[in-house]
């Protein structure tokens, strides 16, 4: 729900094996807000976004990977170590190059 909406704003999304992700707001009589309706279609495409938003369906980590919702599925026991190692790898790169790389899709998102 809200956790996935927050994750949609991130440059990289990983899931622990066994994780379940979704935007079940419609089942609660609520609108998912801009994160769900604006960011989700950019991440998974409009057809998958409509499916997830209109049904409130929850997907497991493997399906999230297949949909492009996450870029990696990591065993739960190793999750923290793996994401911290990735953070260290990114932090060790050139900051300006990293910043410019994350801005690669900004013109597309503002149209």
Short names for language-model regions:
Residues 1-54, 67, 82, 86:
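CoA-thioester-processing core
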Residues 56-63:
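Acidic, divalent-metal-coordinating active-site segment for phosphoryl/phosphodiester hydrolysis
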Residues 14-19, 27, 61, 70-111:
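C-terminal long alpha-helix characteristic of the crotonase
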């Amino acid at each position: 729900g809200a956790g996935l909406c927050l994750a949609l704003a991130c440059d990289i999304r990983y899931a622990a094996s066994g994780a379940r992700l979704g935007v079940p707001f419609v089942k609660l009589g609520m609108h998912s807000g801009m994160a769900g309706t604006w960011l989700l279609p950019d991440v998974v495409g409009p057809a998958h976004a409509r499916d997830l938003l209109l049904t409130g369906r929850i997907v497991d980590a493997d399906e999230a990977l297949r949909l492009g919702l996450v870029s990696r599925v990591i065993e739960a026991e190793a999750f923290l170590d793996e994401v911290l190692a990735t953070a260290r790898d990114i932090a060790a790169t050139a900051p300006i190059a990293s910043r410019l790389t994350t801005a690669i899709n900004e013109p597309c998102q503002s149209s």
